[in-house]
C-alpha cells in the first residue's frame, strides 16, 4: 500500500489546527492572498497577539507559510500565505494515515479556546 496523503501524525496536527473556527477563517482569508499580521488582525477583527498565536499553530501544522520582509520605510513585516496543500479525506486515506501514527493514542497539544 502506497501512502499518498499525509502521515497519521501530520493529519492529526492539520485537522486539529483546522478544528478552531478562527484558524479556519484565517486560512480562508489567506487563500485570497498573502497578508501581514497587523492588516490581517484588523481585517479579521482580533488582537495581534491572539492572531499571532493562531498563525503559529497553522504554520506548525504546515498549512501556512510566514516570511519576514522589509517595507519601503525599512520596517520588518511578517507576511503569511497559504502553503500548497490538497487534503482529501476518504476512508482509504484515513486508514493509510492511521497505519502510520507514531502512537495508538496521539496527544494533540491544544490551547484552551
Language-model-detected regions and their locations in the chain:
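Conserved segment of winged-helix/HTH DNA-binding domains
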Residues: 72-113
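Residues within the DNA-recognition helix of helix-turn-helix
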Residues: 54
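Long, low-complexity, charged/polar intrinsically disordered regions in eukaryotic proteins
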Residues: 1-7
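Alpha-helical residues within the helix-turn-helix
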Residues: 42, 59-60
Amino acid at each position: 500500500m502506497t501512502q499518498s496523503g499525509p502521515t497519521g501524525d501530520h493529519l492529526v496536527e492539520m485537522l486539529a489546527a483546522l478544528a478552531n473556527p478562527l484558524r479556519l477563517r484565517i486560512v480562508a482569508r489567506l487563500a485570497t492572498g498573502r497578508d501581514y499580521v497587523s492588516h490581517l488582525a484588523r481585517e479579521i477583527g482580533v488582537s495581534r497577539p491572539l492572531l499571532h498565536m493562531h498563525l503559529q499553530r497553522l504554520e506548525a501544522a504546515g498549512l501556512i507559510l510566514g516570511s519576514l520582509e522589509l517595507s519601503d520605510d525599512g520596517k520588518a513585516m511578517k507576511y503569511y500565505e497559504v502553503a500548497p496543500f490538497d487534503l482529501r479525506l476518504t476512508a482509504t486515506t484515513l486508514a493509510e494515515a492511521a497505519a502510520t501514527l507514531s502512537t495508538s493514542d496521539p496527544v494533540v497539544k491544544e490551547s484552551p479556546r
